[in-house]
Amino acid sequence: MRYITTPIYYVNDVPHLGHAYTTIIADTLARFYRLQGHETRFLTGTDEHGQKIEEAAKLRNSTPQEYADKISFEFKKLWDEFEITYDIYARTTDTRHIEFIKAMFLKMWQKGDIYKDEYEGHYCISCESFFTQSQLINDCSCPDCGKQTRILKEESYFFKLSKYQDKILQWYEEKDPILPKNKKNELINFVQNGLKDLSITRTSFDWGIKLPQEINDDKHIIYVWLDALFIYVSSLDFQNKGENAKFWPAHVHLVGKDILRFHAIYWPAFLMSVDLPLPKFIGAHGWWTKEGEKMSKSKGNVVKPKEVVDAYGSEAFRYFLLREVPFGNDGDFSENMLINRINAELSNEFGNLLNRIIGMSTKYSQGNISKEGVLKFYNAELNQAKEHLNLAVEFLENLQCNRYLEELFKALSVANLAISKYEPWSLIKENKHEQANALVALCANILAKTSLLLSPTLPKSSQKVALALNFEISSANYTKMILDNELLDFKANPCEALFPKVEKALLKQEIKEEPKKEESPKIKIDDFAKIEIKVAKVLDCQNIEGSEKLLKFQLELDDKEIRQVLSGIAKYYKASDLIGKQVCVISNLKKAKIFGHESDGMILSAKSGDKLVLIAPEQLVQNGSLVG
């Protein structure tokens, strides 16, 4: 049995390229497992609770439920256009899920894994997550999305995440569940640095699931991530031992790299707490840019999946996303690269091979293609293609989607090269009809086997090949043609071009929008006067062990005062390059403890896009000079 899930997508905005990528990978896997004969369930859906949804609904003069219904419908509509064959469309507002999450919360509470306390810290509304000071970028920005965090203080229930630290590390070691493999070390380092207990309720908004009645505390809403993760189980009707309950645990959770921590640390701990088995694999993919730039409305470079599909078709888009980038790496969307893939691979290698087979078989044997003679004349080519096909299966099972497609097109190349090498038209002229017909049969069998394995990614095109050669894409033929490596006879039928050549770019260019500037709240001059900014000289600067972001400065403000200040600029500056330079520092902030080190002040910097520069006097001035 195979159970595949995408994340349930947050409905604060319409579907984007990242959503499409995850879902197309999941759909390819689900189709592949069905083709292999596995009983399969594929879940996708929408995450509809939380502060972001509440605020987005208010902006649109809508209730949260009305807003969630609208965006959830947009996701379903897009997945239909992409040929997505999900079995379960899950929503966190479903009554069955709400009752299940309350039962799970109560079970954790009764086990002693939940306790009540007070939390104060940096909270990112966009990511619905708390962060420690040491995790922040530039002292106040979210490390995941880059948006400014808020200091939030509220009563909260906490989950004893720290209790499961060793068990999570043991799971990584014994089961090796993280794909791609290089992501595992990042998680191990994070967990080994120490897991803090997790705040799992909120009181600052209303849109969410209330605590179980047994706990008798109506103020609290269950944390959106605790709510959302358990939908993978609740949607199988697990609590009622429904028909789909047997599919747990999941074979693979597919996620973007930004939410790997939630799935690979929080989720296994939650499952351990309620005594449920853990998923077999968690696969984390990268992000997408457009032509080397981060996508944003202000740049006018947002790739809208529906527009790409309308212009080039869902199959070309599905193929491009999976073929273009290794799973786990960041990808770059380029319309020119999409066109190149269509013309060079889908049209030339794939579609043109079908045209050649139909043309030759019609001309040489009235469309009848017999496997007789293939092993006699072309056994080497057949074995070469078989190696590529077997590798393709292996790569897809390990989520290496680009390598899977690469190997399939190498198999097609074996057939195309065989035609060029042996020239069936020349064989016919030499009266070598048996060898010529065997060559056509070799190519037809390679194309049929390849199309069978391409069908999870290109379902419509593969079906056209099956109709043109008169065979069936089925689990029975997977066993016969791939596992048993049998050859088939075919009857060729006329077929339209699978992928016509694309002569010019078809996407409309977006008009660049002027970025909307958010007005900061006005302050009085008296308030500003309270801030003391001084010039200081960097006497020493060092990296902090265990942190990729923090630098530790020893600053001289005047002859008598030396201060230690921490700043999250290690990604932008080398520590040794800053020694001897002057910087500007807010000198009258309360002392803070960051990553176990005292920090007495804040070094000023300016950030523009991906660049950050320190604020410094234009000319050398006396240390301790006031700015302002």
UniProtKB/Swiss-Prot annotation:
Annotated function: Is required not only for elongation of protein synthesis but also for the initiation of all mRNA translation through initiator tRNA(fMet) aminoacylation.
GO molecular function annotations of the record: ATP binding; metal ion binding; methionine-tRNA ligase activity; tRNA binding
Binding site for ATP: 297
Main location group: cytoplasm
Family: Belongs to the class-I aminoacyl-tRNA synthetase family. MetG type 2A subfamily.
Classification via NCBIfam families: metG, metG_C_term, PRK12267.1
Protein name: Methionine--tRNA ligase
Gene Ontology terms: cellular component: cytoplasm
EC number: 6.1.1.10
UniProt remark on cofactor binding: Binds 1 zinc ion per subunit.
GO biological process, one term: methionyl-tRNA aminoacylation
Catalytic activity from the UniProt record: tRNA(Met) + L-methionine + ATP = L-methionyl-tRNA(Met) + AMP + diphosphate
Subcellular localization: Cytoplasm
All residue ranges annotated as the tRNA-binding domain in the record: 527-628
Cofactor requirements of the protein: Zn(2+)
Pfam annotation, one family: tRNA-synt_1g
Source lineage: Bacteria, Pseudomonadati, Campylobacterota, Epsilonproteobacteria, Campylobacterales
The entry's keywords: Aminoacyl-tRNA synthetase, ATP-binding, Cytoplasm, Ligase, Metal-binding, Nucleotide-binding, Protein biosynthesis, RNA-binding, tRNA-binding, Zinc
PANTHER family: METHIONINE--TRNA LIGASE, MITOCHONDRIAL, METHIONYL-TRNA SYNTHETASE
Placement of sequence motif 'HIGH' region: 9-19
Subunit structure: Homodimer.
